[in-house]
Amino acid sequence: MRINKIQLHNFRNFSDTSFEFPSQFTVVIGENRRGKSSLLQGIRLAAGTFLLGLDEPPRLHIQKEDVRRIDVGQRFVPQRDCFFHAWGELNNQHLEWKRTLAREGGRTDYKEAYPLIELAENLNNRVNQRLENSVDMPVFCFFSTARLWSESKQRIDLKKKGSKIKDGYGKCLDIKSDRITSLQWIKANYYKQLKGKDTEGFITGSSQSNNNLCTELERTGMGRRLG
């Protein structure tokens, strides 16, 4: 999935601003409090519209803190019609979608986001209803500064069987870090390999690679929490 352009209207500190992303890699540079995080939040919500078409992942909506406010002296007045409008493509289809929070305290509508939602629903049905194994799903990763050191130390248990959709998209756009899910998967497949069972993905590599991984986890202190 690719977002080529996004318009932010009454969104955080943007009254009405558009951004284009013409290349495969975009770097945003600016002084503090100039809107870099606001832009990332808008992109996060735009990408999160895809999740509305899936059965299990959490939904993302425009929140009251996303609504632009104007200083009128004694108070800040929230502005109406806070929205993001995005243009992009997924699986070679050009898409345009928009979500709006008409007023503070209302709900984020999705009536203009159906092109992306319906495409997501189709992919979801292929995975969960038709049980197809070769479905090209988009990859989402969101990393904000809030992810740094936001998790306390905790024990990592073996990963039990679950949903491919839920596992893949459960916390993909969460503002907090989640290393537990991936490490559960690594640990479960590592134990499968030790028992001679079939494993998934990159865990099918050599035993030496897995030993190096465990050694590194122990060196960083995470190995003790894996046990």
Indicate where each model-derived feature is located.
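Zn2+-dependent metallopeptidase catalytic core
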Residues: 209-221
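P-loop NTPase switch/coupling surface
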Residues: 1-187, 198-205, 222
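Long, charged, glycine-rich C-terminal linkers/tails
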Residues: 223-227
